[in-house]
Curated annotation (Swiss-Prot):
PANTHER family hit by this protein: CYSTEINE--TRNA LIGASE, CYTOPLASMIC, CYSTEINYL-TRNA SYNTHETASE
Annotated positions binding Zn(2+): 31, 216, 241, 245
Stored SMART domains: DALR_2
Residues reported in the UniProt entry to bind ATP: 277
Molecular function (Gene Ontology), one example: ATP binding
Keyword field: Aminoacyl-tRNA synthetase, ATP-binding, Cytoplasm, Ligase, Metal-binding, Nucleotide-binding, Protein biosynthesis, Zinc
A GO cellular component entry from the record: cytosol
Cofactor entry: Zn(2+)
Reactions catalysed according to its record: tRNA(Cys) + L-cysteine + ATP = L-cysteinyl-tRNA(Cys) + AMP + diphosphate
Subunit text: Monomer.
Keyword Cytoplasm in record: yes
Protein name (database record): Cysteine--tRNA ligase
Short sequence motif named 'HIGH' region, residue ranges: 33-43
Length: 459
């Protein structure tokens, strides 16, 4: 029987059965980072959501049938400004932040995309598309800029489902006097005086650089063609970025529908507030890594809420994710687990618009099953279901021993445990208690065994 994957499409505002244009060549594009600042936890939500989507599509159609493109935006005004602020070159900044992004994705257990193109390597494709738009009267030159004529695009507001006036209400419009319409957006902008040479490129309109929106249209076209299946990104990209992508791509290639399914993940707040540097609640993934919060904990937190709903980062949410993973790892401890077929109810939860809260509940139910099982066979079956389901969503990639002792200096702890055992032999109870309390402060729990040995675990 054909698997049916129901996915919410922002374009139609309904859940649809995912039906790719070619089941042997499923195409997926996701907007990646602008590499001017270390990625924050909001960026990480997008990374994890589309990693899960990629895993599901691979499960249905096979790894060889799926092409996942996630771009790197390495040309942008923000990059120029931050490089100047830090006193480094553009290349130094973008290389450093790109490497950090890759470390963050690995920390969160994300698979590599099939292709990760950089905007600066595709300027020729951008120029070619802009030339097509000018030739078709969808773009024009004004004051050394090239602008897209928004009013020339059919169904410009289709994705956002708002009228034009509402969409631009309160939006700062640059160079409005030189444009045909205030809403027109830039496709190409001229170089400014004293700007870094490696952030500007030769073009038919002089030295300059592309606008943000044309970059994704060019890279998706280069690797996926005029039409592809899935386009993903954060809900904040619906307007203007994705709206403008659709407009320029469909106008450049009139027979194109561009992306068939538009998928958007919800916003992430911190303690109920929007994340911002001014509020002092701007949290990067590196901050979490430096706190030695395990990547699986952050990943489970990000999957604990439905991807389209808002998600709030707070200490309790992270603590709850850690407790849940502790529970799962404890459930499979000392059991010979086997990889089994994905349980039907678990897979159905993910096929229903990636219902991860239900998927997590199902894993919890299997963990409960381990502890109430009456036979070893039943325990093994439940434990095997836990590891199979968790692995599929990118979790539980360690042994229980590795998990509970992660970040622990085992040699140091074993030395103290042996020192305490020696103190007990000599009936130096004061020293033995001091060592126990010292380890307890470091969240190491000692368990004295009937045979006189001591085992330890991380709290």
């Amino acid at each position: 029987m054909q698997i049916q994957f129901h996915l919410y499409n922002t374009l139609s505002r309904t859940k649809e059965v995912f039906n790719p244009q070619d089941q042997a060549n499923v195409k997926m594009y996701v907007c990646g980072p602008t590499v001017y600042y270390n990625p924050h936890i909001g960026n990480s939500r997008s990374g994890v959501v589309y990693d899960l989507l990629y895993r599901i599509v691979i499960k249905i159609f096979g790894e060889k049938a799926v092409k996942y493109v996630r771009n790197i935006t390495d040309v942008d005004d923000k990059i120029i400004d931050r490089a100047a602020l830090l006193g480094v070159t553009i290349d130094e900044l973008t290389d450093k932040v790109t490497k950090e992004f890759h470390k963050n994705m690995a920390y969160l257990g994300c698979m590599l995309p099939s292709i990760e193109p950089k905007a600066t390597k595709h300027i020729d494709v951008m120029i070619a598309i802009i030339e097509r738009l000018i030739a078709k009267d969808h773009a024009y030159i004004a004051d050394n800029h090239v602008y897209f004529d928004v009013l020339s695009a059919p169904n410009y507001t289709e994705l956002s489902n708002r009228n034009l006036e509402e969409m631009f209400e309160g939006v700062h419009v640059e160079n409005s006097k030189t444009k045909k319409n205030p809403q027109d957006f830039v496709l190409w902008k001229p170089a400014k005086q004293n700007e870094s040479a490696n952030m500007n490129f030769e073009s038919p309109w002089g030295l300059g650089r592309p606008g943000w929106h044309i970059e994704c249209s060019a890279m998706s076209y280069k690797y996926l063609g005029e039409n592809f299946d899935i386009h993903g990104g954060g809900a904040d990209l619906i307007f203007p970025h994705h709206t403008n992508e659709i407009a320029q791509s469909r106008c450049a290639f009139p027979s194109s529908t561009y992306a068939k399914y538009w998928v958007h993940n919800g916003f992430l707040t911190v303690n109920g507030e929007k994340m911002s540097k001014s509020l002092g609640n701007f949290i990067t993934v590196r901050d979490l890594m430096d706190k030695q919060i395990q990547g699986e904990v952050v990943r489970l937190f990000l999957l604990s809420s439905h991807y389209r709903r808002p998600l709030d980062y707070n200490d309790k949410a992270i603590e709850d994710a850690k407790k849940t993973l502790d529970y799962w790892y404890r459930a499979i401890e000392n059991i010979n687990v086997q990889k089994i077929d994905l349980p039907h109810d678990f897979m159905q939860s993910l096929l229903d618009d990636m219902n991860t809260p239900l998927a997590v509940k199902i894993i919890n139910d299997y963990a409960k099953g381990v502890f109430i099982s009456k036979t070893e066979e039943e325990r093994q079956l439940n434990a095997s279901a836990i590891i199979t389901c968790a692995n599929f969503i990118g979790l539980m990639n360690k042994t229980p021993h590795e998990w509970f002792n992660s970040g622990v200096d085992e040699l140091y702890i074993n030395e103290l445990v042996n020192k305490r055992l020696e103190a007990k032999k000599q009936k130096n109870w004061l020293l033995a208690d001091q060592i126990r309390n010292q380890l307890l402060e470091e969240k190491i729990i000692l368990e004295d065994q009937p045979d006189g040995t001591t085992i330890w675990r991380k709290e």
